[in-house]
Amino acid sequence: MALFRLPSSGPAALAPRGHGLLLRAPQMSDYVQWAQLRESSRAYLTPWEPIWPSDDLTRAGFRRRLRRYAEDIAADRSYPFIVFRESDGTMIGGITLANVRRGIVQAGTIGYWVGEPYAHRGYMTTALRVLLPTLFGELNLHRIEAACIPSNTPSIRVLEKCGFTREGLARRYLCINGIWQDHLLFGLLHEDFRG
């Protein structure tokens, strides 16, 4: 089991909290709650996500996911977080900083999902606001990017409420639910962040 244990210090141990939420890296002990929330939210999430692998919600699939997460964190490529309500430990959703680029770029791409029972209640806006100081602070990023399907109004609102600027449209940018879809591109610079 040590294979899936993430370091207790350094970037892998990031666990920002605030406004009643805790964000931390996924652990094997999260499997049951994660699989239940994803399964119960499948119809809600499907229009906005890539096609799920056939074994995505299995324990073995979750183990592979954790292994990949550990490798990505160690290589400074990606930082996944599960979002919990702090008062009762309820899992709300997840946020991942992916495609981390260093050197002269110092940027990464944010993606997120929220379980259907917690959608449209401000949880993801709050979670992103809690995470941004960590991304600009501890991870020392200059720029955070995001992309969303133009019809995903709730996601657009999350980004705009968190200070992201709409920067353009990327045609047929990502394969979502089996279809290459246009995406609005958003960015947030460190100097524009009011954390």
Residue ranges: model-predicted function:
Residues 71-76, 164:
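Short loop/turn motifs at secondary-structure junctions and domain boundaries
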Residues 68-72, 134:
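A generic secondary-structure signal
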Residues 46-67:
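Conserved GNAT-fold acetyl-CoA-binding loop/helix
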Residues 1-33, 37-47, 80-195:
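Acyl-donor (CoA/ACP) binding surface of acyl/acetyltransferases
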